[in-house]
A protein has these predicted regions:
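Ribonuclease/tRNase effector modules and their secretory precursors
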Residues: 1-125
């Protein structure tokens, strides 16, 4: 029996959804850029995406992100893939300079579900 080739993880839809749902909550005038990084479980591929805004981010501007920001989004992929992506955006941790995004990817065909974590980091220049 031939071993089934694992499909390479494509982060395009994930990045698009983060841009659509997460970024509008933050004042773009105060961001230098936003760095989105993640790791695909299957092949440990790094996902990197830089959104350029052309403005310096000062330390004080991090206060513009509301304390305890807590947004939950659900993004359903095309029904043929039978996948559901949940986006949970939270300003947390001691380091107020990043927003953690946890994505739960569950497949209706299998009983297994796994978590992918992505950091949206506000770079301070």
């Amino acid at each position: 029996m031939a071993k089934k080739k694992r499909k390479k993880y494509d982060p395009t839809h994930l990045i698009a959804a983060i841009e659509k749902w997460a970024l509008p909550f933050y004042d773009k005038k105060h961001c230098y850029y936003i760095y989105v990084e993640g790791r695909a479980r299957s092949n440990q591929t790094r996902i990197e995406h830089i959104v350029e805004h052309g403005h310096d981010l000062k330390v004080r501007d991090l206060d513009l992100i509301p304390e305890g920001i807590n947004h939950y989004f659900e993004y359903k992929k095309d029904s043929t893939y039978k996948n559901t992506y949940n986006y949970y955006i939270n300003r947390g941790g001691k380091d107020k300079g990043f927003i953690k995004v946890s994505i739960r990817i569950s497949d209706k065909d299998s009983k297994r579900a796994w978590i992918k974590t992505i950091f949206i980091t506000y770079k301070i220049k």
